[in-house]
Regions:
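Condensing-enzyme catalytic core mediating Claisen C-C bond formation in acyl metabolism
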Residues: 2-28, 149, 234-300, 304, ...
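Conserved active-site "lid/cap" helical segment
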Residues: 2-75, 79, 170-182, 192, ...
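Conserved catalytic cysteine-centered active-site region
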Residues: 28, 60-115, 148-151, 161-167, ...
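Active-site-proximal alpha-helical scaffold in enzymes
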Residues: 90-122, 175-204, 265-272, 337-338, ...
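Flexible glycine-/small-residue-enriched beta->alpha junction loops
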Residues: 115-173
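Active-site pocket-lining segment
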Residues: 172, 208, 216, 286-357
Length: 404
């Protein structure tokens, strides 16, 4: 590590619980949901002059509903950050939250920023239906799209050239192309659930969660303080599920990530401002890389992104102690592991559960990976962590962190 380069440090990180689709967090507006971890960061670090924040980068994939007017800045204002602190919403679909963390670190490393907030928010429960304007007057053929996930307003040329497979279809494509067995997918799903339930019981996940209080019209407020998606299951139960793309398919609701709600925020600083405001650096952001892949097999994106960030940082997979691989689907997660020469059950991967168990609120997930990775590094004494994700329309993203 060169002493001449400004370093970017993660000094704090916190998230909401991840709620099920239509679950406890579904009554909270997206911009209000995004404000919750920001408010928690401010409360946990009262000594910070929040007017010194250079920018707020928040990931968000939808932007068709209550997140439509730059939700990063709306959430910042709702959280009580000074009005002169700007904010920008990043949209790299599923990788948005991780991109926000990496981009904030880049701003600090460049010397243009000293104190940054990064994170992401997504309320998939509250994703609206949208419709285009009619092509002709008095048309009765207007389509209506559900913006929860996947394609809408499809470009015919895109469809002709690359196809517009749904997310489960891309996972089925990966399973076919890379010969990922149904049983292996179910094993990964079961392991994710078991690890998440164990992490909840051990209190590991509680370290990164701020409780959300939801007032009720009648009776006491509801307090949500843990993820709603983890559940007990078995190989027998998973094996009974039908394929979501076709009845004999391998991708099921049980071995795919959830449709969820949640938000997450991280505080990043250079060494000077961390010292000035009494912040304790927890991890250094070593590097970030992105990669493009064919949209029909978007799930393999983490493999080339990981190889790029390893080459960029001069590290090898053998030096990585903690791996947070976003489990969009077990099929793509297993394909990535095998492409990287790792075992299906590598103990470094998702030790506290992955997205199959914890959920995948698109724009928030990457920030959650970074948050969990930092906590796992400190819990295990490891040095380096890799966070990596696949991205719809054919991309991958990877970030490497170093424990401080």
């Amino acid at each position: 590590m060169s002493s001449n380069i400004t370093q970017a440090f993660i000094c704090d990180a916190i998230r909401t619980p991840f709620g099920r689709y239509g679950g406890a967090l579904s009554s909270i507006r997206t911009d209000d949901l995004g404000a919750i971890p920001l408010r928690a960061l401010m409360a946990r670090n009262p000594q910070v002059d929040w007017a010194a924040v250079t920018d707020v980068f928040y990931g968000n994939a939808n932007q068709a509903g209550e997140d439509n007017r730059n939700v990063a800045h709306m959430s910042s204002l709702l959280a009580g950050l000074p009005i002169d602190v700007p904010g920008a919403t990043l949209n790299r679909l599923c990788g948005s939250g991780l991109d926000a963390v990496g981009s904030a670190a880049r701003a600090i490393k460049s010397g243009e920023a000293g104190l940054m907030i990064a994170g992401g928010v997504e309320s998939m429960s509250r994703a609206p239906f949208v419709m285009p304007k009619a092509e002709t007057a008095f048309s009765r053929n207007t389509a209506v799209y559900d913006t929860t996930i996947g394609w809408r307003f499809v470009n015919k040329l895109m469809k002709e050239k690359y196809g517009v497979d749904s997310m489960p279809e891309t996972a089925e494509n990966v399973a076919t192309d890379y010969k990922i067995e149904r049983e292996a997918q179910d094993r990964m799903a079961l392991a994710s659930q078991m690890k998440a339930v164990a992490a909840q019981k051990a209190g590991h996940l509680a370290r990164e969660i701020t409780a959300v209080t939801i007032p009720q019209k009648k009776g006491d407020a509801i307090v949500v303080d843990q993820d709603e998606h983890p559940r007990e299951t078995s190989m027998e139960s998973l094996a009974k599920l039908k394929g979501v793309v076709r009845p004999d398919g391998t991708v099921t609701a049980g071995n795919a990530s959830g449709v969820n709600d949640g938000s997450c925020a991280l505080l990043l600083a250079n060494e000077t401002l961390a010292g000035k405001y009494g912040l304790t650096p927890k991890a250094r952001v070593v590097g970030m890389a992105t990669a493009g892949v064919a949209p029909r097999v978007m799930g393999i994106g983490p493999a080339p992104a990981t190889l790029k960030v390893l080459a960029q940082t001069g590290l090898s997979l053998d030096q990585i102690d903690v791996i947070e691989l976003n489990e969009a689907f077990a099929a793509q997660g297993l394909a990535v592991l095998r492409m990287l020469g790792l075992k299906d059950d590598d103990e470094r991967v998702n030790a506290w559960g992955g997205a199959i168990a914890l959920g995948h609120p698109l724009g928030a997930s990457g920030a959650r990976l970074a948050t969990t990775a930092v906590n796992r590094l400190h819990a295990t004494g490891g040095r380096y962590a890799l966070c990596t994700m696949c991205i719809g329309v054919g991309q991958g993203i990877a970030v490497i962190l170093e424990r401080v």
